[in-house]
Amino acid sequence: ASDVYKRQIQLLGRDKTFAVEDPGYEKIRKIYNSNNVKCVSIPIDEEGVNIDALKAGNADILHLSPSHHYPTGIVTPIGRRYEILGWALNCESRYIIEDDYDSEFRLLGKPIPSLESIDVSGKVIYMNTFTKTLSPTIRISYMVLPVQLMQLFKEKLNFYACTVSNFEQYTLAAFINKGYFEKHINRTRILYRRQRDMFIDAINKSPLSSII
């Protein structure tokens, strides 16, 4: 994923101001700072990124995890997601980086569509990885670019070679296309939900339940 972040910086420009969630995944801030781009912190509230703070932050790019925020676990509701998209629409140079890591294993509540899936104006860069869903040894991350940024990527960064072998890419593609990945996610989600319920039940039955 670190390489994906660096490609995004090169694509969007080091003259842009990147905003990250506060609190948030500290590694992201360090990557931006190490690549000599201005990085500002946007506080979160009970629904995710605070819109008033975002508007006052003078950021060009917002990097967030709306479906499974780290470290709070907050899931941004659909109304706030549309507000965030509205912020991006107010300026041509604004974009949103939707980091959807670990969103597949949300165990409570109804599914909420990703920002990218409800974006009709090409303002969202979607990124994810298979490290959590399949195995830490599968070092494959990806990003989905809006049409206009895809064209810019081809013009500016098409000289980069993929660090993942063709064999791994084709194998993973076949695994997805044949429906095995979706079945795997569904089975794993059920397993994790059972494990969570057993853990909570054990805590409730513990003599220490009143203080945990």
Residue ranges and their predicted role:
Residues 10-26:
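Conserved PLP-anchoring active-site segment centered on the Schiff-base-forming lysine
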Residues 124-205:
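PLP-dependent aminotransferase class I/II
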Residues 38-45:
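Short beta-strand->loop structural element characteristic of the AMP-binding/adenylate-forming
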Residues 28-31, 202:
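A generic "structured core" feature
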Residues 46-107:
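Active-site phosphate-binding strand-loop segment of PLP-dependent enzymes
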Residues 1-5:
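Short, small-residue-biased leader/transition segments that mark boundaries at the very start
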Residues 208-212:
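Conserved PLP-binding catalytic core of the aspartate aminotransferase-like
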Residues 16, 37, 90-94, 122:
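A short helix->loop->beta-strand "cap" motif at the edges of active sites that frequently abuts
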